[in-house]
Amino acid sequence: RVRYTREADFLGKGTIVCVERTENKVPFHVVSRQGELSLQSDRLEVRVDLNTCALTYKDARTGKVLLYERQEMPREAEKTYMENVVYDPDSRRSEKTADGEKEVMDVLRRDTVGWTWKCRNHFRWSEGEALYGLGCHMEDFLDLRGKTMYLCQHNLKEMVPVLNSTAGYGLLFDAGCGMKFHDGPEAGFMEL
């Protein structure tokens, strides 16, 4: 499990997806090398670049790289303010949209009610690697390579924040929020 925050401590209560394990913890040892820290279990090795904090995941038995984060900026976070939008009930009207007739109202005011973080985790996938998952969508493709997906619960879409790779690993994004997946020519990211 990898966790990230820009705060001194993790905020909130988390989600119900990942729960702390109190038994059967995976034994591992730490190896310190020049500019790098390596956490090794019998099956997985996670290398941490001490300059950029970029992570590299390797199969401990074969040495094969499973996944690595973009070296120059593995993750980024931006503080975002949350608003409560108050609408003018006297402006209620119907408008025709692509989704059919919708009831709309004018915005009366926007109240700032708090803040949160918008985070991006940047990855570099292997050549020829296919990525599957992230739920049930209406698109006509399975492999997510080269695609952009906006992940949220919707009438015709179901979001499941799990990404599976033909390279032999899977990622669960335990964020409890809408997300954006993007894979471009240089690298990909998951935005939470």
Give a label for each model feature:
Residues 1-39, 75-78:
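A low-complexity, Ser/Thr/Gly/Pro-enriched, surface-exposed linker/loop concept
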Residues 31-192:
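Catalytic and substrate-binding clefts that recognize carbohydrates or anionic sugar/phosphate headgroups
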